[in-house]
Design a protein with these regions (language model features):
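Amphipathic alpha-helical "coupling" segments that flank catalytic cores
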Residues: 1-318
């Protein structure tokens, strides 16, 4: 309320009236939604557009199932976790067609978890349904369960790959599909879980799910290249936030990257080595050799001039 403190009882009564009405609506939606199991709502997703050029949300659910299977095997998930991930992938988007989420979109995921538990799904499945939206914003919780991690990565890489494949990429301040946030989410989940996961293979798996079903504007190779660069920029920010110097990070990422956890280990290794007194000596030697190499003219070595066996072995090795 703006203004004076006069007539607060009237203001309170008005607010309570509005709040009671909204709570009554929410209770009605909740009871209506529970009249059928969450799984029975999935076919209705065939009528919900995911993205105008990428099919329906039901199509996305099918892709999530394929990606969850792929990731589960790559990450060596046990059969039980893989079972939970498969089921959660099928149910992940079902709450989008519930009365509650239609009226309160910000409750997606929350209601999926609640309805899954209330209609007999395993708690691990319900948790994964909720966790697949995590992290929702910077500093948010990460998925705590392996099925949740699998489903979260699957959901986000599907969004990113699909958008890139039809030519939709963030530019400047424009990022209508929140692809930067989703890429950061993938990075944090993989790094936190220390997963041995190749971005190249992950993007290929996601791309293959679209192939032959929608019209893609870019080739797999181009999409992999663009997404690798996109993720490289996200990793630069993450490593910088962890206290690594920009030149250390740039040096490691300069040749490109594919494996998230391996890249972090290399950044840490280089940062540690830079504290070693031998690093400066090595850098001096390399700089001199590099400068000489820039000035050198091209030539072909003549193996007939080699005299020592060690020279011949070195020549063969090179």
């Amino acid at each position: 309320k703006n203004g004076t403190a006069d007539h607060l009882d009237i203001v309170r009564a008005g607010n309570e009236k509005v709040l009671r009405a909204r709570l009554a609506d929410a209770n009605f939606f909740y009871e209506e939604d529970l009249k059928e199991p969450l799984a029975e709502k999935v076919p209705a997703l065939k009528k919900v557009v995911f993205q105008e050029n990428l099919g329906t949300v039901y199509d996305k659910v099918e892709r999530l199932g394929v990606l969850a299977e792929f990731l589960g095997k790559v990450l060596n998930a046990g059969e039980q976790d893989l079972k939970y991930a498969r089921r959660a992938a099928y149910l992940a988007k079902a709450d989008l067609v519930t009365n509650m989420v239609y009226e309160f979109p910000e409750l997606q995921g929350y209601m999926g978890r609640e309805y899954a538990e209330r209609t007999g799904e395993e708690k691990a499945v319900a948790l994964a349904i909720y966790e697949h939206y995590l992290p929702r914003f910077a500093g948010d919780d990460l998925p705590s369960s392996l099925p949740g991690q699998i489903l979260s990565i699957s959901d986000k890489i599907d969004n990113i790959t699909g958008c890139f494949a039809i030519g939709i990429q963030p530019s400047g301040s424009q990022d209508p599909y929140a692809l930067r946030r989703q890429a950061l989410g993938i990075c944090h989940i993989i790094l936190e879980g220390q997963f041995d996961l190749s971005l190249e293979h992950l993007v290929e798996a996601a791309y293959r799910c679209y192939e032959g079903k929608v019209e893609l504007k870019l080739s797999l190779e181009k999409v992999q290249e663009d997404i690798a660069e996109f993720f490289k920029q996200r990793l630069k920010g993450i490593f910088s936030d962890r206290g690594f110097s920009y030149d250390t990070v740039d040096a490691v990422l300069a040749p490109g990257f594919q494996n998230f956890s391996d890249t972090l280990l290399r950044v840490q290794a280089l940062a540690d080595f830079r504290q070693d007194p031998a690093f400066d000596d090595l850098l001096t030697v390399y700089t001199r050799a590099n400068n000489l190499a820039k000035k050198a003219t091209a030539f072909r070595p003549d193996p007939s001039l080699l005299q020592e066996s060690s020279e011949e072995k070195l020549y063969q090795a090179l």
